[in-house]
């Protein structure tokens, strides 16, 4: 498996994420962009609710492939093919920016993210005004 269109192989059993997840939104958006009918994917309707549950389904032999995050795949001895980078923000009231606990939070995120495969903390000192 190297790309979304590889899921069209009927011999490949797919395990999906639930419809409300960001992972599912990523998949469904990719399918629309590539003109792929989800009903042609073997297992598209089989859903799990966490990245770990997807990994466990693959390990249990219930599926051959599913979408998930790198650290969960590697923790479970599974292969990983990156499809997309995502950017997350920390949202807080302006008053919190000068609070010492906010600085501690940023340091912890930097420390933790550097230890988890697939994650990196970038631009944590940059403030984004009116990002909504």
Predicted region positions:
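N-terminal hydrophobic or amphipathic helices and topogenic motifs
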Residues: 2, 11-13, 112-132
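Short acidic active-site motifs
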Residues: 2-3, 53-54
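Short loop->beta-strand "edge-of-pocket" segments that line small-molecule binding or catalytic clefts
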Residues: 5-27
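Short helix-loop-beta junction
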Residues: 32-37
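Short beta-strand-to-loop elements that line the ligand-binding cleft
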Residues: 38-50
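A ligand-binding cleft/hinge motif common to bilobed small-molecule-binding domains
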Residues: 55-84
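Periplasmic-binding protein-like
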Residues: 78-107, 122-132
């Amino acid at each position: 498996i190297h790309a979304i269109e590889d899921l069209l192989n009927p011999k490949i059993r797919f395990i999906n994420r639930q419809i409300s997840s960001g992972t599912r939104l990523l998949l469904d958006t990719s399918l629309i962009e590539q003109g792929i009918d989800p009903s042609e994917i073997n297992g598209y309707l089989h859903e799990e609710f966490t990245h770990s549950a997807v990994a466990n389904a693959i390990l249990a032999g219930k599926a051959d492939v599913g979408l998930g995050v790198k650290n969960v795949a590697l923790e479970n001895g599974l292969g990983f093919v990156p499809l997309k980078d995502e950017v997350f923000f920390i949202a807080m009231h302006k008053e919190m920016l000068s609070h010492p606990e906010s600085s501690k939070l940023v340091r912890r995120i930097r420390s933790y993210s550097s230890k988890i495969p697939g994650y990196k903390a970038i631009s944590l000192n940059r403030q984004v005004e009116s990002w909504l």
